[in-house]
From Swiss-Prot:
Record CDD domains: DHQase_II
Function: Catalyzes a trans-dehydration via an enolate intermediate.
Keywords on record: Amino-acid biosynthesis, Aromatic amino acid biosynthesis, Lyase
Family as reported in the entry's similarity comment: Belongs to the type-II 3-dehydroquinase family.
Listed name of the protein: 3-dehydroquinate dehydratase
Organism: Halalkalibacterium halodurans (strain ATCC BAA-125 / DSM 18197 / FERM 7344 / JCM 9153 / C-125) (Bacillus halodurans)
Site positions per UniProt: Transition state stabilizer: R18
Gene: aroQ
GO biological process: amino acid biosynthetic process; aromatic amino acid family biosynthetic process; chorismate biosynthetic process; quinate catabolic process
NCBIfam families recorded: aroQ (TIGR01088), PRK05395.1-2 (NF003805), PRK05395.1-3 (NF003806), PRK05395.1-4 (NF003807)
Residues engaged in binding substrate: N74, H80, D87, L101, S102, R111
EC number: 4.2.1.10
Residues at the catalytic site: Y23 (proton acceptor), H100 (proton donor)
Record has Iron as a keyword: no
Pathway: Metabolic intermediate biosynthesis; chorismate biosynthesis; chorismate from D-erythrose 4-phosphate and phosphoenolpyruvate: step 3/7
Length: 145
C-alpha cells in the first residue's frame, strides 16, 4: 500500500486548544484519524507525524524519499524562516504540498512569507482540515499520471 506522509510542525499538537477561532476545534488526534480514514478509503496509507523540533521535520522529509508517494507538510511557524526545511524539501524528488489551516495571507504580515512554498508542488491555505484532504487528493491524482 502506497503511503502519504503527513508532517505537522510546531504547536500543531495544541490543535483544539490553541486559538480555536483560528485553527478550529479538532485536535491533532482527530485530524490524524480523519486523514488515516480518508487515505484508506482511497487505497493508501497516511503516516501522520508531528514535532515541535526542526530537525525531526527535516529527518522525516528526508525519510519520505523512496518511502512515500508524497508529503503533506504544515511547517507551522517554520514556514516563515526555516531555510533548513526549505532545503530538505528541495533535496527530495517526492512531491510536497504545503498546507495551513488558516489563511496566512489574511493574518499578521510576518505570516505572509513562506520560504518553503517555492520548493513545493503547491500550497493550500485557509480551508481548515479540508485543506489536508485536498492536498491528499492532489498527491493521489498525481500518482495516477
Amino acid at each position: 500500500m502506497e503511503t502519504i506522509m503527513v508532517i505537522n510542525g510546531p504547536n500543531l499538537n495544541r490543535l483544539g486548544k490553541r486559538e480555536p477561532d483560528i485553527y478550529g476545534r479538532e485536535t491533532l488526534s482527530d485530524l490524524h484519524e480523519r486523514l488515516i480514514k480518508f487515505a484508506e478509503a482511497r487505497g493508501y496509507k497516511a503516516d501522520c507525524r508531528q514535532s515541535n523540533h526542526e530537525g525531526d521535520i527535516i529527518d522525516w522529509i528526508h525519510e519520505a524519499e523512496g518511502r512515500s508517494s508524497g508529503v503533506i507538510l504544515n511547517p507551522g511557524a517554520f514556514t516563515h524562516y526555516s531555510y533548513a526545511i526549505r532545503d530538505a524539501i528541495a533535496s527530495i524528488s517526492v512531491p510536497v504540498i504545503e498546507v495551513h489551516l488558516s489563511n496566512v495571507h489574511a493574518r499578521e504580515s510576518f505570516r505572509h512569507t513562506s520560504v518553503t512554498a517555492p520548493v513545493t508542488k503547491g500550497q493550500i491555505v485557509g480551508l481548515g482540515v479540508i485543506g489536508y484532504e485536498l492536498a491528499m487528493l492532489a498527491l493521489l491524482e498525481g500518482e495516477k499520471k
